[in-house]
């Protein structure tokens, strides 16, 4: 049975990406996904252009490019492990997170998450993400406590082999679905 609706972002995870080139052959590996608790919202816009070619007075041919996605992930707090492993902040000997200006590039990572569905959750993975440093903001407490959030600006580019994103479907096998957060799912190159 298929989902009719989706709602409720949850189970956000990230897995550091390592890209290696040996003898001209590029390979990709991922660390074990780690949870990022406290997901509030995600909004990712598709990146790419559609270019028409006109002939005979009509759009004769149209090309589309897939340049991945960009947008925001809002969460309660960015975990310390994500700040050190992905954003490359340093934890000093006294346990203080230190951000330095010489970090010009954050680590690439896979972003895994899911939306509830009326039948079954829909699980996603974006394979080549980068995140920019979050803004710092808060406000004073008034009559009631209103928790603040932190937002990561994300870019999910295609990997050099073209892989952008995967998601579970109506017929995803049980082992793949159940193991979604144990390892980063990589599609079989001989399929599809």
Walk through the language-model features, giving the residues of each.
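Solvent-exposed edge beta-strands and adjacent loop segments
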Residues: 2-83, 131-149
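Structured, beta-strand-rich domain cores
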Residues: 61-127
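Context-gated lysine
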Residues: 4-6, 10, 16, 34, ...
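Short amphipathic beta-strand/extended segments with alternating polar/hydrophobic composition
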Residues: 29-34, 123-129, 166-170
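Mixed-charge, glycine-accented linear interaction segment located at domain edges/termini
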Residues: 129-192
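Short secondary-structure transition/capping segments
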Residues: 16-17, 121, 155, 160
């Amino acid at each position: 049975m298929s989902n009719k609706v989706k709602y409720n972002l949850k189970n956000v995870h990230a897995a550091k990406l390592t890209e290696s080139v040996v003898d001209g052959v590029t390979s990709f590996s991922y660390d074990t996904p780690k949870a990022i608790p406290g997901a509030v919202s995600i909004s990712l816009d598709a990146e790419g252009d559609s270019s028409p070619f006109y002939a005979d007075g009509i759009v004769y041919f149209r090309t589309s490019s897939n340049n991945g996605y960009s947008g925001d992930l809002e969460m309660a707090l960015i975990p310390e492990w994500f700040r050190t492993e992905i954003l490359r902040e340093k934890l000093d000997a006294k346990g203080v997170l230190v951000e330095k200006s010489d970090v010009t590039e954050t680590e690439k990572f896979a972003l895994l998450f899911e939306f509830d569905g009326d039948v079954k959750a829909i699980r996603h993975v974006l394979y080549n993400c980068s995140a920019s440093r979050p803004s710092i903001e808060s406000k004073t407490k008034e009559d009631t406590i209103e928790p603040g959030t932190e937002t990561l600006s994300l870019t999910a580019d295609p990997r050099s082999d073209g892989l952008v994103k995967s998601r579970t479907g109506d017929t995803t096998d049980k082992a793949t679905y159940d193991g979604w957060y144990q390892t980063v799912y990589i599609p079989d190159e001989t399929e599809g």
